[in-house]
Amino acid sequence: MRKIIVHTGYVPYDIVRTSQTFAPKGIPASFIMLTPEINIVEQTSKLLDNMNDGDILDIATNNVVTVYTIRAYVVKHADEYNVEYRYYTEDDYKLDDPSKYQLVKQGEHGDFINPPEGFFDTIDNLLNQMLGLE
């Protein structure tokens, strides 16, 4: 079994420093948001494809495309991967204690279990509002 830990929110520096991030080499931080979404999907999928049994991968990201890619990937490979999301609030960040976070699990259909308010639901909420479903 391979384990993916996704650190998100106000992630403490020590965790960012030791986790995988998806900043393309040679790209200034101010341009990271201009990375085409398909490149993010491909880069994330490739990273997950290259994991070996027993590996633990820490990823630090607030990128919705990365998180949705991980969600879909784990659903497709449910027998091989386990994922947990660690959400750090601004208060957690100020404590400077990496053990302070809210744990969010993922169900077998990619649904978040016990997510805090606003946890990667922006796209879903916006779509529901546009369709008049909320």
Model segments located where?
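RecA-like P-loop NTPase motor core
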Residues: 1-29, 45-49, 54, 65-134
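C-terminal catalytic-base region of ester-bond hydrolases, centering on the histidine
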Residues: 32
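S-adenosylmethionine-dependent methyltransferases
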Residues: 35-38
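Intrinsically disordered, Ser/Thr/Pro-rich regulatory regions of eukaryotic transcription factors
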Residues: 40-43
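Structural recognition of the conserved hydrophobic beta-strand(s) that form the central parallel beta-sheet
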Residues: 56-61
